[in-house]
Amino acid sequence: MVKQLTDAFARKFYYLRLSITDVCNFRCTYCLPDGYKPRGHHSFLTLPEIRLVGRAFADLGTEKIRLTGGEPTMRRDFTDIISVIRENKLIKTLAVTTNGYRMERDIAKWKEAGLTAVNVSMDSLDPRQFHAITGQDKFFQVMRGIDAAFAVGFSKVKVNVVLMKNVNDISLSAFLHWIKDRPIQLRFIELMETGDGGEMFRQYHISGEIIRERLLLDGWHLLQRSRSDGPAQVFSHPDYQGEVGLIMPYEKNFCQSCNRLRVSSIGHLHLCLFGEQGIPLRDLLASEKQLDDLKLRIQDGLRHKRETHFLHQGDSGITPNLSVIGG
């Protein structure tokens, strides 16, 4: 039995972000403004390979898996992927990050298959601005998808907003009004510099500190984080059903509480969103007989995890855009 995943800085890893495709049907300005373009001839992880990845990480103490992309729900076998991961009772939380365009139609069957949490990208509450940011006129469809999630029994929906200067930072009041009577955790994510997005970053990056100051002045309180939570600082207010999260990767000590690893859609273990090439796992995903070797490679790979990212130096590693490793 391999012990709980722990790195050289005594950080324990309970959370896996598993990308299952690079393909996305949206053209978000900060990620894929020119649309999805295949990189090389790699095939994405198969259902049996995904099952084995899930088993290995569960045996190593992982409690939470988040399915990412690209747009993960574009896979035809997406519901089956949920089912095979949920076969493993050690995985307590199975989440998805989605652009939401298929939620209205499919959220009920995803929940039935075992999905326990959902994050939806929603960078604007204005339909025209939403269209301009995403390249898709699907604002109302995504909104109906969020309503559908509540209708089938999700008690909370997380909504991701990539914070952009003079685009949506000026809409904080509208966002707060939206969550006043809805159990939505609204998560403002600082725009991060990637290989393809340097100019976008310089033009639109703004610190989440501005929102944090406003929240604290208005009586919001910081909540305690659990060991499998993501990196958001989450705030609550007695007058609001919803919550506000801030993800601020440029803040000092952001990496100190890192609890998550990433596996890309082609089967590489990435120790950091902004790390290097990744550690190949796919040669150990052909058979369950390789499970012990797979776990040992994952464990051994953690020796190379750095204490922090180097975004402050403008080093985004090999990440050309966030669809490649899964944000």
UniProtKB/Swiss-Prot annotation:
Pathway annotation from the record: Cofactor biosynthesis; molybdopterin biosynthesis
Disulfide bonds: none
Any one biological process term the GO annotation gives: Mo-molybdopterin cofactor biosynthetic process
Summary of subunit composition and partner proteins: Monomer and homodimer.
Tagged with keyword Repeat: no
Keywords: 4Fe-4S, GTP-binding, Iron, Iron-sulfur, Lyase, Metal-binding, Molybdenum cofactor biosynthesis, Nucleotide-binding, S-adenosyl-L-methionine
Binding site residues for [4Fe-4S] cluster 2: C255, C258, C272
Catalytic activity line of the entry: GTP + AH2 + S-adenosyl-L-methionine = (8S)-3',8-cyclo-7,8-dihydroguanosine 5'-triphosphate + 5'-deoxyadenosine + L-methionine + A + H(+)
EC assignment: 4.1.99.22
Family matches, as InterPro entries: Aldolase_TIM (IPR013785), Elp3/MiaA/NifB-like_rSAM (IPR006638), MoaA (IPR013483), MoaA_NifB_PqqE_Fe-S-bd_CS (IPR000385), MoaA_twitch (IPR010505), MoCo_biosynth_MoaA/MoaC (IPR050105), rSAM (IPR007197)
All residue ranges annotated as the Radical SAM core domain in the record: 8-232
PROSITE patterns per UniProt: MOAA_NIFB_PQQE, RADICAL_SAM
Cofactor, free-text remark: Binds 2 [4Fe-4S] clusters. Binds 1 [4Fe-4S] cluster coordinated with 3 cysteines and an exchangeable S-adenosyl-L-methionine and 1 [4Fe-4S] cluster coordinated with 3 cysteines and the GTP-derived substrate.
Family assignment from sequence similarity: Belongs to the radical SAM superfamily. MoaA family.
Binding site for [4Fe-4S] cluster 1: C24, C28, C31
Sequence positions that bind GTP: R17, R66, T97, K158, R260, L261, R262
Transmembrane segments: none
Gene Ontology MF terms: 4 iron, 4 sulfur cluster binding; cyclic pyranopterin monophosphate synthase activity; GTP 3',8'-cyclase activity; GTP binding; metal ion binding; S-adenosyl-L-methionine binding
SUPFAM superfamilies according to UniProt: Radical SAM enzymes (SSF102114)
Gene name, Swiss-Prot/TrEMBL: moaA
Protein name, UniProt field: GTP 3',8-cyclase
Organism: Photorhabdus laumondii subsp. laumondii (strain DSM 15139 / CIP 105565 / TT01) (Photorhabdus luminescens subsp. laumondii)
Cofactor(s) of this protein: [4Fe-4S] cluster
